[in-house]
A protein has these predicted regions:
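N-terminal leader/targeting and pre-domain segments
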Residues: 1-298
Length: 298
């Protein structure tokens, strides 16, 4: 476990416990938890935990797998501005208050499925380099997926959204599924209050897609998703050839840097690779923002 002084990721302090695996599974926290600005070299397990007070995990880096699944949060919980180098799991969890996962980077598969969000939840401004699983969940408050980039398939099927949902300004490079599971079976989601927002005129942002294999079929008992001639939500479009080629090249750079980082045992080389990955993520975020901007600002 390492700690970043004042949240500065470039100047972490490595301690004698840096190389350990941490297992907090099935713990009960009756007091506020402050784990922000931490760096875990090996896997960490917070699965099955119960938090009766607030929990703060923001600004952290997980070099291996991170497990937060099957947990219960009675107060707010923040995972903002964090980096997950391996698999990350929050599936099967219950949030009684607000939850925040903004400005994060996920290099491995990420699982939020089979969860209940009692308050608002935001996954905004994040990068997903593998599959993202949000299916079979209940969202009782506002849910935000906007301003993000998803490289792999995204499954949001078999879910209930009781409040507003926003996805504007995001890019889905692979399929976005609201109506089917992994095997193509029909499990449509339901939007109780309003249709999801893919275009925000006030923010001058639309949503772009890289695949034509999306599924926007939702339950008839709720609001439907209006589609245009291209089979995409109204006001949305596909990535151009140039845009698709650009982001594919960036993905290759990320993959190569991640591979070298995984295999390297040289401290300075590892630090250089981490800085390269951070720079690539910043470039991709800036490109995503420019690509999803509406012409003329409206």
């Amino acid at each position: 476990l390492r700690h970043f002084p004042q949240g500065d990721r470039r100047n972490y302090v490595e301690g004698s416990w840096s190389g350990f695996e941490y297992d907090f599974s099935n713990s009960v926290f009756f007091y506020p938890v402050d784990m922000k600005d931490s760096w875990y070299q090996n896997s960490v397990d917070f699965s099955g935990c119960t938090y009766y007070a607030s929990a703060e995990f923001s600004g952290s880096t997980y070099e291996r797998s991170a497990y937060f699944c099957d947990s219960t949060y009675y107060d707010w919980v923040f995972f903002n501005n964090s980096t997950y180098c391996g698999e990350a799991q929050w599936s099967g969890s219950t949030y009684h208050d607000s939850a925040r996962f903004n400005w994060s980077v996920y290099y491995g598969e990420v699982s939020f499925h089979d969860s209940v969000y009692g308050g608002s939840v935001f996954f905004d401004q994040s990068l997903y380099y593998d599959e993202a699983l949000f299916y079979s969940s209940t969202y009782r408050g506002e849910a935000g997926f906007d301003g993000s980039l998803y490289r792999g398939s995204v499954f949001v099927n078999d879910s209930v959204f009781e409040d507003e949902v926003s996805l504007y300004g995001s890019i889905f490079c692979d399929a976005l599924n609201f109506g089917t599971d992994f095997f193509g079976e029909s499990y449509p989601s339901r939007f109780v209050q309003s249709a999801p927002c893919f275009v925000a005129e006030k923010n001058a942002r639309a949503t772009l897609f890289g695949s034509s294999s999306n599924n926007f079929v939702v339950e008839n008992s709720g609001y439907s998703i209006a589609l245009g001639a291209k089979g995409l939500p109204l006001g949305c479009g596909f990535l151009s050839t140039g845009q698709a080629d650009y982001i594919a090249a960036k993905f290759r750079e990320v993959y190569e840097a991640r591979t070298y980082l995984r295999d390297s045992q040289v401290p300075q080389e590892r630090q250089d690779l981490r800085e390269k990955l951070e720079s690539l993520s910043q470039n991709i975020r800036a490109w995503r923002k420019e690509a999803t901007a509406l012409p003329g600002g409206n």
